[in-house]
Amino acid sequence: NSNFILARVPLRRFEDLDTSSLNSIEVISSDSEELEEAILSIIDSIRHDHPTVHPGDIAVVFLEGSKANYALADSLAVRIYEKYSWKAIKGYETKDSTSDAVFISNRNNIKGLEFPFVIGLVRGQITDNVFSRNTIYMMLTRSFITSYFLVNNMDANAEFIKKYTIAAKSISDSGIMILREPPEAEKSQQNQKVSIAVAQEQRPLKEVIEE
């Protein structure tokens, strides 16, 4: 089978910023009980590496709409203020992002927005569901400097974390990602999965593709 080579042109949003030395995607795994601390650790790293960063340069986006994630958002907003004296706003409560507040959101309120740094959080198991994968892609493409992909390190995610870590390193090192072209039987199976997922969501396929 042949391979697909996906390439990207590095974005230069700031003339004085050399993005060649920055990782465009970093994959980080954490225990579910330590996700909040992991997010704060990432913010610490951003502040250390970019001393002029503003609160509004950072977005935290969670994949699942679970009670645990909304509770995390509430707690995180308090911790951010206590630790950095920064405000935080929640995208599902207000549509306005601002330069003086960290933007915390679920997946439904991030489309069309861009930030220098995005922390994407997946608390549960990552499946091959087309909508889940599509949302992960959307989260990771909201940043124009670095996306931090924070994943629960449960055993069920081990293979996914391994593959994404390798892919992220390839993108950061060379700007390309090499993908195996699946055989026809696998393509057919994937098409069936997409069709079933779309039917269950009762949404047009075109809408899913353009999401």
Q: Where are the predicted features?
A:
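The feature marks helicase ATPase cores and/or their adjacent C-terminal helical subdomains
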Residues: 1-211
